Regions:
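Hydrolase catalytic cores
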Residues: 1-50, 54, 157-183
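Loop and turn regions of beta-sandwich accessory domains that flank beta-strands and are enriched
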Residues: 69, 73-79, 219-324
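Catalytic cores of secreted or luminal carbohydrate-active enzymes
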Residues: 51-84, 352-374
Length: 446
């Protein structure tokens, strides 16, 4: 990254550190499958593992050469001292049905190391899938999967359920009537999952057989605090200082939800057994370029039982550049009226279908109703008989890869690719003794 910063400064020495950071964001792309990846309220894809992705040096230099320096940074801070208890054992499996006994209506659970139900899942019917050691043949769309621990890893069980269409998984122990464990090796599981005791699981499975209308939901019992913000800014960094007294601070999950609905995980379940967090400062970039005005929600969940804590104080600091934004969409009203003639656009939308959100167009000072998509294709040799075709794509578009070997022959379709981002690629075997020609055809949205 430091080398890329040097390249940017080489073509535009007037760039500030904020300019360089935003250039890195604007030129980045996601290259790894990660279920945590979401588009934030400004349309920028982000996950908690690699942030906005890997910057493209060529695009960064191109953007830097015509970059408009950012306005001065403004910081708005908000403080509160709620002094409230953090509910113990906040991970709960909710069970509803006319035959559900009271002790099974709100079951204490443990969880994975990956995706969490920061918002409650849908209340769904469940399918008892037994131990699950191979792919699930039935369609679980619109359902949750009830699975017993054993033989296969947690990660494989959850993946099989996700492949079958399940929205979430409940895994119950196969040994020890009351034990709850954290499900290791599940950092990249594609759907949320809870773990419950053998006693609760065995009883639920029998109840499911008697009551086909039974429904379940993954939820969290958290302490929540709301900050109402009236300042209109384009968001950059966000800082949250948390002052809490908890016996094992690693049990706490701390999240921040922006007015756009984007959730940042500031702290996840871990093995830190110290007290706190005592006046810890957490920062997130997940909300870059979102509007700041509206409701910001802090949630703190105790994800393990038996230890209790108190939330004493919070301080939220929003950093960004002020704009006039009466409709709170992250687009400056004068810019929006100039290009759209009204205030009916949104920052998340891609009005000209060129792969760039209106918020990105505003950042780069390009026209949001005129496509800026420039098709480029690169041919990258991987070894002596394998090539990678890579091209600038539009998200969601389907591309045909055409190939022609030698001269005077009819080109044939080698395959199709549906793009999920601003770049797509295709690997191909070639004969190094023959000439080969390739063409990419954009077939548009399916």
């Amino acid at each position: 990254v430091s080398g890329m910063a040097g390249l940017a400064l080489g073509v535009n020495p007037s760039l500030s550190n904020r300019d360089v950071q935003q250039l890195l964001i604007a030129s980045a792309r996601q290259v790894f499958e990660d279920p945590d990846t979401v588009a934030n309220g400004a349309g920028f894809a982000h996950n908690h593992n690699v942030g906005f992705g890997i910057p493209d040096a060529g695009e960064l230099v191109q953007l830097a050469s015509q970059w408009h320096t950012r306005d001065p940074l403004v910081v708005k801070s908000f403080s509160t001292q709620p002094l409230v208890m953090i509910p113990d054992a906040g991970l709960r499996l909710k069970v509803e049905g006319v035959t559900v006994p009271d002790h099974l209506k709100n079951i204490v659970a443990s969880t994975t190391m990956g995706l969490q139900p920061d918002r409650p899942t849908n209340l769904l019917p469940m399918s008892d899938e037994g131990m699950v050691v191979a792919a699930i043949a039935k369609d679980l769309t619109g359902k949750g999967a009830m699975i017993q621990r054993g033989t296969a890893t947690f990660e494989r069980k959850i993946q099989h359920a996700a492949d079958a269409g399940a929205e979430f998984v409940v895994i119950y122990n196969n040994v020890d009537e009351a034990e709850l464990i954290r499900m290791a090796g599940t950092d990249y599981s594609p759907i949320p999952a809870y773990f419950i005791s053998k006693a609760d699981g065995d009883e639920l499975v029998q109840l499911m057989k008697r009551d086909p209308k039974l429904r379940m939901q993954l939820s969290m019992e958290s302490v929540e605090h709301v900050f109402e913000v009236s300042d209109d800014m384009i968001c950059e960094h966000v800082e949250l200082i948390v002052d809490a007294d908890h016996s094992f601070r690693g049990q706490l999950r701390i999240t921040l939800e922006s007015p756009s609905g984007t959730i940042s995980v500031l702290q996840r379940l871990n093995h830190d057994d110290s007290r706190g967090p005592i006046r810890w400062a957490y920062r997130t970039t997940r909300h870059f370029f979102e509007p700041t005005a509206g409701t910001w929600k802090v949630r703190i969940t105790d994800q393990d039982p038996d230890e209790i804590g108190t939330l004493r104080a919070l301080r939220l600091s929003l950093m960004g550049t002020p704009i006039e934004d009466v409709d709170n969409d992250g687009l400056d009203d004068s810019w929006e009226r100039r290009h759209f003639g009204n205030l009916r656009a949104s920052g998340f939308e891609d009005s000209d279908a060129d792969g760039a959100s209106n918020a990105r167009e505003q950042l780069l000072q390009t026209h949001p109703k005129v496509s800026d998509h420039l098709f480029r294709m690169e041919l990258l040799p991987m070894d002596e008989d394998q090539l990678q075709l890579q091209w600038a794509s539009l998200p969601g578009h389907v591309y045909e890869v055409m190939g022609l070997s030698g001269l005077g022959r009819t080109p044939k379709i080698l395959g199709t690719v549906q793009a999920h981002g601003r770049y797509a690629e295709w690997m191909i075997k070639v004969d190094p003794t023959e000439q080969a020609f390739f063409q990419i055809v954009d077939r548009g949205m399916p």
